[in-house]
Amino acid sequence: MDSRTGELITAHQAENGVYIWELENPLYFKIHRVEDPLYTRTRVYHVQIRFNHNLRKALHLHKAYLNFQVWTTSMTASGSIYLARFRYLVNMYLDQLGVISINNVVRAVRFATNRVYVNHVLENHSIKFKFY
């Protein structure tokens, strides 16, 4: 859903993509917080993927932040180690695919989190399209 207007994103907007070799560093990965809930054997990573300026320009986006909460049973991986592994798997999937779009990035995250140690993935995105 477009967070500015509240309108649903169309299939054409979600599948509109750019070849990966046309852009340098198209995605920024950030880890906001790592939570260790008390009395559990889980760790929660709050990961944000941002589209860089050239990718947003090519896809006619004003803002694109994809936020994920990854609930894992992995207690040994720190935030930076998990982020490096997560970034590698997402980029590997997109490199094999060759096209970056909103849906392809979500599919890449699904690929990266389809592991034994991942319990749940919660998504909360902030996407705004250009009107002009």
Swiss-Prot record:
Homooligomer. Interacts with the replication-associated protein (REP). Interacts with host proliferating cell nuclear antigen (PCNA). Interacts with host retinoblastoma-related protein 1 (RBR1), and may thereby deregulate the host cell cycle. Oligomerization and interaction with PCNA are necessary for optimal replication enhancement. It comes from the Viruses. The keyword Cytoplasm does not apply. GO terms for biological process: viral process. Coiled coil: none annotated. Keywords: Host-virus interaction. Belongs to the geminiviridae replication enhancer protein family. Increases viral DNA accumulation. Enhances infectivity and symptom expression. This is Replication enhancer protein. Signal peptide: none annotated.
